[in-house]
From Swiss-Prot:
Organism field: Oryza sativa subsp. indica
Reaction equations catalysed: a long-chain fatty aldehyde + 2 NADPH + O2 + H(+) = a long-chain alkane + formate + 2 NADP(+) + H2O
UniProt xrefs under InterPro entries: CER1-like_C (IPR021940), Fatty_acid_hydroxylase (IPR006694), Sterol_Desaturase_Related (IPR050307)
Keywords: Endoplasmic reticulum, Lyase, Membrane, NADP, Transmembrane, Transmembrane helix
Segments passing through the bilayer: 99-119, 126-146, 186-206, 224-244, 332-352
GO-annotated biological processes: anther wall tapetum development; cutin biosynthetic process; pollen exine formation; response to abscisic acid; response to salt stress; wax biosynthetic process
Fatty acid hydroxylase domain residues: 138-272
Function comment: Aldehyde decarbonylase involved in the conversion of aldehydes to alkanes. Core component of a very-long-chain alkane synthesis complex.
Cell compartment(s), UniProt: Endoplasmic reticulum membrane
Protein name: Very-long-chain aldehyde decarbonylase GL1-5
Family, as annotated: Belongs to the sterol desaturase family.
Assembly notes: Homodimer.
EC number(s) per entry: 4.1.99.5
One Gene Ontology cellular component annotation held by this UniProt entry: endoplasmic reticulum membrane
Amino acid sequence: MATNPGLFTEWPWKKLGSFKYVLLAPWVAHGWYEVATKGRREVDLGYIAILPSLLLRMLHNQAWITISRLQNARGRRQIVRRGIEFDQVDRERNWDDQIILSGILLYLGALYVPGGQHLPLWRTDGAGLIALLHAGPVEFLYYWFHRALHHHFLYTRYHSHHHSSIVTEPITSVIHPFAELVAYELLFSIPLIACALTGTASIIAFEMYLIYIDFMNNMGHCNFELVPSWLFTWFPPLKYLMYTPSFHSLHHTQFRTNYSLFMPFYDYIYNTMDKSSDTLYENSLKNNDEEEAVDVVHLTHLTTLHSIYHMRPGFAEFASRPYVSRWYMRMMWPLSWLSMVLTWTYGSSFTVERNVMKKIRMQSWAIPRYSFHYGLDWEKEAINDLIEKAVCEADKNGAKVVSLGLLNQAHTLNKSGEQYLLKYPKLGARIVDGTSLAAAVVVNSIPQGTDQVILAGNVSKVARAVAQALCKKNIKVTMTNKQDYHLLKPEIPETVADNLSFSKTGTAKVWLIGDGLDSAEQFRAQKGTLFIPYSQFPPKMVRKDSCSYSTTPAMAVPKTLQNVHSCENWLPRRVMSAWRIAGILHALEGWNEHECGDKVLDMDKVWSAAIMHGFCPVAQG
């Protein structure tokens, strides 16, 4: 929102929320009716093509979002090296409003503008006219309108909303108040209306012009330099006809320079070009050819079939919220399966997120496999090869710590990471599975005054550490599985071994639960029971009768941890899993020991370090 919102700032269909697309329904239905009732030669192809055009533009914009986020996560050729936060993502979530407005205007034009009906596929003279009118009137009028928007009166009421984003994403380009964007649409309609009135309009020329506007807008706000220098060497005048991402980035950091739409020519002739434009462009290309150095690499992986949309390079709005299964995502199953096949064939991890905390640089890399792949025996070797390759690459890049998240640390897969340490004994990076912090989070999540708990579910490395810690605190631990009880009993010190027992009829109101716990066993718990997971994945919440569930082991992150604008799987905003935080603490504290295999660090030391650096327990559900 602008600092002092003016008239017609809010979009008129804001209250419709996700139902705003119904605004286009009358024209879409009319188009289908035309197709159904008229012959092929009588149907207005241009009118019918508007809906596919809008869908193509949405796909085009989403492609830019994904590419930009992947590139900026790597840090390569990045222009502004600052992070963005959730407030910017929330502010820019309605980027499709501009496409809806454009669609309404296109439908109205196709119905009522003379010469806008029954357009041919292509006319060269019309395409030339569009190019001339854009380079002339559109660019000229936009330049002076843009300068006017930077006057205090208009800036505070309208344009400041756009400039709230100093670090831009591609969709920042269309984040404007309603009145301002209407003015832009009227500007861009000049070439289209002129072609219609002169009888030179064509479907392909119109679509190419709209794609050109979207492409240049997205490119100018993508925050990484992608225009090669050889283009300007080969054709020097291009410098005045096409801006670069670094050129427009200066407008968002300096505010009073580089006003041009897409053609810097007008900034040159009116002396408003930023003097550092060429230097920033060259530095963005020259100094960022290598990926950004990293101190901590966290290895994660895809979970469900639709989880790819919730990762940071996916849908920005989905990534900014905890993962939940949405019914309408099922309609995207063809794309989901295609994404799975593509990631399955991809032979390397890929960077999905970059964060900074106290000069410690962190990246999250995703292993291109889904959770169900980890349960397939014939996939384990390939997955191990992918993880091993990622560990070696991180070590080569100078990473101090590699933390293993989700199933990448499964004991049956790689002995909690010990397999890589045995194969590469001179590995410089510390391998961390995060058991100590995960166990500490579970122990400190138990309400004070609790004297007994029930431990149910598969006995993992974290479960062992939790059971040992609780027994040492003289808290009674009751296990519901006899086989697991006999497996864990020898690992408890003899002096406190009596605190671990087996019973099928435990009455404790605190349950520590892991993977493998079925619904029937949950129903054995009393009303008012608190379920605290110690597993990587959240349990199925089947008890709605006054029972409560904690999150999987996790902590809220401090404000010093920057560039956090996506949720880690199902966790709330600015909350990270204990396994991921453990790697960060390892680097912050400069610990030189590995935590993998059977090794577990001192839980009290790790917990104290987490609190000292500003990580906080998550409020219980």
